[in-house]
Swiss-Prot record:
Transmembrane segments: none
Protein name: Ribosomal RNA small subunit methyltransferase H
Organism placement in taxonomy: Bacteria, Bacillati, Bacillota, Bacilli, Bacillales
Binding site for S-adenosyl-L-methionine: A32, G33, H34, D52, F79, D100, Q107
Described function: Specifically methylates the N4 position of cytidine in position 1402 (C1402) of 16S rRNA.
GO CC list: cytoplasm
GO molecular function: rRNA (cytosine-N4-)-methyltransferase activity
GO biological process: rRNA base methylation
Catalytic activity: cytidine(1402) in 16S rRNA + S-adenosyl-L-methionine = N(4)-methylcytidine(1402) in 16S rRNA + S-adenosyl-L-homocysteine + H(+)
Family of the protein in this entry: Belongs to the methyltransferase superfamily. RsmH family.
Enzyme class, UniProt record, top EC level: transferase
Keywords tagged on the record: Cytoplasm, Methyltransferase, rRNA processing, S-adenosyl-L-methionine, Transferase
Main subcellular location: cytoplasm
Presence of keyword Cytoplasm: yes
Amino acid sequence: MFHHVSVMLNETIDYLNIKEDGVYVDCTLGGAGHALYLLNQLNDKGRLIAIDQDLTAIENAKEVLKEHLHKVTFVHNNFRELTNILNELEIDKVDGIYYDLGVSSPQLDVPERGFSYHNDAKLDMRMDQTQSLSAYEVVNQWSYEALVKIFYRYGEEKFSKQIARRIEAHREQQPIETTLELVDVIKEGIPAKARRKGGHPAKRVFQAIRIAVNDELSAFEDSVEQAIECVKVGGRISVITFHSLEDRLCKQIFQEFEKGPDVPRGLPVIPEAYTPKLKRVNRKPITATDDDLNENNRARSAKLRVAEILK
């Protein structure tokens, strides 16, 4: 069963100031915890567009949301297609959009999906099982330089070069096929002293490969910039991130649209063209409560940012 404990469930939805007849978009349906909480607040005129690139998540969500199916439109797609999705549904603007980024618990906990460095499985890490690129191709076919780049950029791994060299040496003998084979190779590239601190030694490289396989940061940047144009004035966007790269990107995008263009000096009245597109509802990100942490250890790194559309 696809069981997933949603992080900061109440805060993410409550900050959207739900209108009972509003139209909302869940860009990361996952275990549908946030969706269920939101749908309980909508009347029969309200609507939720539920997007996920994982078909398994969508099928399980249909069971979780079975009492609300008349209010939900399920979409199997990448959230970077947000504008196209809404256009196809003939929806101009929505009342709110939210994101719960990162891998859902079921994806991590089902060994066959190949996301976890604790369980042995074929290298995969595809959120969308229909796409061709998997972790196997990244590990066995990408160049040394490309591996160094993603390990450093997406994993912030300081031993990127050493790990990439070990991968290169191993795959010349035979392909690296499973998650635990890769873990062993990663450990070879990290000095023993460094392996003993900072969590699991493979954590950063696995994160980097997962982000590369699913093009996560680029997809999120594309999507949230579209979301800013798709939400009505007064509507809001909630984003939960789980690592510093996502959080930094979200903060930068919100800041950029909050700033607006430079205003020429001497204008008695500021034209609307120079007013900001949005305002950040919370200057500092909201973090998980003790209750969240007790229910889900993955909430420890979660941060919530919220923006309200002004024009």
